From Swiss-Prot:
Domain (+)RNA virus helicase ATP-binding: 1-110
RNA-binding keyword on record: yes
Protein name stated in the entry: Movement and silencing protein TGBp1
Entry similarity comment: Belongs to the Tymovirales TGBp1 protein family.
InterPro entries for the chain: (+)RNA_virus_helicase_core_dom (IPR027351)
Primary location group: host cell
Complex and partners: Homodimer and homooligomer. Interacts with capsid protein. Interacts with host AGO1; this interaction targets the host protein for degradation, thereby suppressing the antiviral RNA silencing.
Domain (+)RNA virus helicase C-terminal residues, every copy: 111-216
Keyword Transport among UniProt keywords: yes
Note in the entry: TGBp1, TGBp2 and TGBp3 seem to act together for cell-to-cell propagation. TGBp1 is the main movement protein that physically cross the plasmodesma with the viral genome. TGBp2 and TGBp3 would facilitate TGBp1 function.
Length: 216
């Protein structure tokens, strides 16, 4: 898909990985890859894009990011895919930190997020995840019974889920929260953040736009 190469270079950083039949693009959460794919479809309406995440709602224009079923030129969240199901694929996208599946070497990357802010980037940095942001947000730690939850609740760990179930409080698990964004998130974790599984931890820490309260 040579005609997209210039477009990719305007938005993503080219790595030293040699060209291959399928171009691989890796981004951090909130980088704008979904918007980029939608704009690519506007500029090239002959393309078909499919996602292993949440597809777009059908629209009057007749194009958007479709569900996973069928051939495609573009596949989003590709670590969850069997690319043999998409023989025409030329570009694949993913935030590889959100997946357990095998990932390919990236031709293009983006480590800048438009979702959360600098405080979250600093926290992620202590966990080995490098990303940048131009905006401000807040990250606060507190004891599980010493602060009131704010916004949407995410439970990290089975014991955290059990506590919220016993209190009949609605919450998301990281798997359920994947692909969702909320202004404020309260994360109840049953172990120190650094001891939690990396994929679930990363998803849970990147769902908010303004504030994150971590209760342990």
């Amino acid at each position: 898909m040579e005609f997209c190469g210039g477009t990719l270079r305007t938005r993503f950083q080219r790595t030293s990985v040699p060209n291959s039949p399928v171009t691989v693009v890796h981004t951090v959460a909130g980088s704008g890859k979904t918007t980029f794919i939608r704009n690519l479809l506007i500029d090239h309406p002959q393309l078909v894009a499919r996602t292993y995440g949440t597809p777009d709602v059908p629209n009057l224009l007749g194009y958007g990011i479709r569900d996973r079923h069928g051939d495609a030129h573009i596949v989003d969240e590709y670590p969850a895919a069997d690319l043999r199901s998409h023989p025409s694929v030329s570009i694949v996208f993913a935030d590889p930190l959100q997946h357990h599946g095998e990932v390919r070497p990236a031709h293009f990357t983006c480590s800048h997020t438009h979702r959360f802010g600098k405080s979250t980037c600093s926290l992620l940095g202590t966990l080995g995840v490098y990303c940048t942001s131009d905006k401000e947000d807040s990250v606060t730690f507190a004891g599980a019974y010493l602060a009131e939850p704010v916004g949407t609740l995410i439970a990290l760990g089975e014991d955290a889920e059990l506590v919220l179930d016993n209190h009949r409080v609605e919450y998301f698990t990281p798997c359920q929260a994947l692909g969702l964004t909320f202004p404020s998130v309260t994360l109840l974790t049953d172990a120190p953040i650094e001891d939690q599984p990396p994929v679930s931890r990363y998803i849970a820490l990147t769902r908010h736009t303004d504030s994150l309260l971590i209760l342990n």
